[in-house]
Amino acid sequence: MNQTLLSSFGTPFERVELALDALREGRGVMVLDDEDRENEGDMIFPAETMTVEQMALTIRHGSGIVCLCITEDRRKQLDLPMMVENNTSAYGTGFTVTIEAAEGVTTGVSAADRVTTVRAAIKDGAKPSDLNRPGHVFPLRAQAGGVLTRGGHTEATIDLMTLAGFKPAGVLCELTNDDGTMARAPECIAFAGQHNMAVVTIEDLVAYRQAHERKAS
């Protein structure tokens, strides 16, 4: 990742800490991966605190594929089958079947309905019958071990939520440009500045976790 673009957001470790602060303050975070991977920026929000306004922003400026990142334990708790048995996508993204809250929604498409679905999936004691399938929210199963196992936005989201003190569940959506093309780092950074979001890279998070795990050992 071009460090010059990111310099105004501090050092890699400072960027992670600022991202955690943003999440705790109820703000979003822009998570960038490497130029040689997807080369995309994802808007992420804690599943516990995401507002209807934030969901509307995500739908308006994102790809439209609003995803709920969850752990394998939560996937099993909700009895959500993986979308396919043989995942042949380029990066092995762990989509499950799509979901909708069983109660409290209309068509499931609106920002409010999608927030209701997210809350239904992550609440304490959530059970399979709390969700209908299919729906308009796309759960993503994160790999155990987070970004140290797989350097994806899904794992980064779970790691950031955990480090910030939230349940291991977060909402993400890829940022797109107004013409429908994918936003790259310069556009993602500009958007984050306009919407008071912190910016962090997956590379930053890997280094941060590695350093803290070395200290712990």
Swiss-Prot record:
- Its EC number is 4.1.99.12
GO function terms (MF aspect): 3,4-dihydroxy-2-butanone-4-phosphate synthase activity; magnesium ion binding; manganese ion binding
Quick one: which pathway? Cofactor biosynthesis; riboflavin biosynthesis; 2-hydroxy-3-oxobutyl phosphate from D-ribulose 5-phosphate: step 1/1
User: How is the cofactor bound, in the record's words?
Assistant: Binds 2 divalent metal cations per subunit. Magnesium or manganese.
Tagged with keyword Metal-binding: yes
A Pfam family per the record: DHBP_synthase
Q: Where is this site: Essential for catalytic activity?
A: 136, 174
State where Mg(2+) 2 binds. 38, 153
List the InterPro entries hit by this protein, alphabetically: DHBP_synth_RibB-like_a/b_dom, DHBP_synthase_RibB
Which residues make up the binding site for Mg(2+) 1?
A: 38
Role of this protein: Catalyzes the conversion of D-ribulose 5-phosphate to formate and 3,4-dihydroxy-2-butanone 4-phosphate.
In its UniProt entry, what is this protein called? 3,4-dihydroxy-2-butanone 4-phosphate synthase
**Gene behind the chain:** ribB
